[in-house]
From Swiss-Prot:
PROSITE patterns: RHODANESE_3. InterPro entries: Rhodanese-like_dom, Rhodanese-like_dom_sf, SelU. It comes from Sulfurimonas denitrificans (strain ATCC 33889 / DSM 1251) (Thiomicrospira denitrificans (strain ATCC 33889 / DSM 1251)). It catalyses: 5-methylaminomethyl-2-thiouridine(34) in tRNA + selenophosphate + (2E)-geranyl diphosphate + H2O + H(+) = 5-methylaminomethyl-2-selenouridine(34) in tRNA + (2E)-thiogeraniol + phosphate + diphosphate; 5-methylaminomethyl-2-thiouridine(34) in tRNA + (2E)-geranyl diphosphate = 5-methylaminomethyl-S-(2E)-geranyl-thiouridine(34) in tRNA + diphosphate; 5-methylaminomethyl-S-(2E)-geranyl-thiouridine(34) in tRNA + selenophosphate + H(+) = 5-methylaminomethyl-2-(Se-phospho)selenouridine(34) in tRNA + (2E)-thiogeraniol; 5-methylaminomethyl-2-(Se-phospho)selenouridine(34) in tRNA + H2O = 5-methylaminomethyl-2-selenouridine(34) in tRNA + phosphate. This is tRNA 2-selenouridine synthase.
Length: 364
């Protein structure tokens, strides 16, 4: 069959659903946006067939594969593919290199009267396309960097701007010591793939200027591409200035209220216990930088707030905890870092002033 597809750009722009027939272990190492893993072989089957291929050659490996994936097992997998195709009529199929696994899957579906295009070159070719686009993307836009103290509401401002890219959202991390979320961060490969998707879409939309939050070389476990780091070094830095009371409110909402809701939605039986343990673990990680005396104090404030919530259901006690962390931990680090880059600051203002300035700078 020659039902091949290699218009990778259209996959990105249309956010095309993808049927990934690689083994689960391959999928976990890296996949694409809108891809669903419905493997033709599970990990154990793939391992055994790989050994056979190495020792006895391709023909024997294919023969073994057909014998292992047959009968009810084969039927269940084909049914899963058909169900996915029925729900996503424009779906595309891929394996690692666009070879035997996706071709055989395509043939099995053809026998059932279902036609699906497979990616030419498979995962490897599409991944190469995305990495190349990621590498050359900085040639097509000018960056603007949005900075500001922790809790100033930078993400809120970014969400209002069509030409922004939420790096913390892509990394599933808030970018601070307390920034980890309940769901695990994506693999580095997935982070890069998703970032490439975003950049391709924004550039295609005609944006010549893109706004990013001020980040370091990594966001949690996700490392920033070198070309973005080097481009951001000379970009204008816009500082969002927010009063401390508002910062406390934003921090309380993100790190306490929303975080606890996430634990509740995830089905944890002991929400406060699980959430508070994660906060206490995070505080232990900063004890060296914070100092023993301040660590003891902030821990006591947190435990008092936790007791108050258990008794009354109120979040108010956490305001003192958030304010202490902002002023005693985050702000000194911010002041030190921003002092070294003060010459890059192009503008300072509140949320509306910053948004207006960036829009003028972006010519939106």
């Amino acid at each position: 069959m020659t039902l091949l597809f290699d218009d990778f750009k259209s996959i990105v722009l249309n956010k095309t659903p993808l049927l990934d027939v690689r083994a689960p272990v391959e999928f976990k190492k890296g996949a694409f946006l809108n891809a669903v893993n419905l493997p033709i072989m599970n990990d154990e089957e793939r391992h055994k067939i790989g050994i056979c291929y190495k020792n006895e050659g391709n023909a024997k490996a294919v023969e073994l594969g057909h014998s292992m994936v047959s009968g009810d097992i084969k039927e269940e997998r084909i049914k899963a593919w058909i169900a996915f195709m029925d729900a996503n009529p424009n779906a595309l199929l891929y394996c690692f290199r666009g070879g035997q696994r996706s071709k055989i899957s395509q043939e099995w579906l053809h026998v059932r009267g279902k036609e699906i295009l497979r990616l030419k070159g498979g995962y490897k070719a599409f991944r190469t396309y995305l990495i190349n686009k990621l590498s050359e993307s900085t040639q097509h836009f000018k960056p603007i960097i949005l900075g500001g103290r922790t809790g100033s509401g930078k993400t809120i401002v970014l969400e209002k701007m069509k030409n922004s890219i939420d790096l913390e959202g892509l990394a599933n991390h808030r970018g601070s010591s307390f920034g980890s979320k309940l769901n695990a961060q994506p693999m580095q490969i997935d982070f890069e793939n998703n970032l490439a998707y975003e950049l391709i879409q924004k550039i295609e939309d005609g944006f010549k200027t893109l706004v990013f939050e001020d980040e370091g070389k990594h966001i949690g476990n996700a490392f920033m591409p070198e070309n973005l780091i080097s481009t951001a070094i000379n970009a204008p830095l816009i500082i969002l200035e927010t009063q401390i009371d508002k910062r406390v409110e934003i921090t309380l909402n993100e790190y306490v209220v929303q975080a606890q809701e996430a634990y509740l939605e995830a089905g944890f039986d002991f929400v406060l216990e699980e959430w508070s343990q994660s906060i206490q673990n995070a505080m232990k990680r900063i004890v060296r930088r914070l100092g023993n005396e301040k660590y003891t104090k902030v821990t006591a404030i947190f435990e008092s707030a936790l007791d108050e919530q258990k008794k009354s259901g109120s979040y108010d006690g956490y305001k003192e905890w958030a304010k202490f962390l902002l002023e005693e931990y985050y702000d000194p680090m911010y002041d030190y870092q921003i002092q070294k880059r003060s010459h890059m600051v192009a503008f300072r203002g509140d949320a509306q002033e910053v948004q207006n300035y960036i829009e003028r700078l972006s010519d939106i």
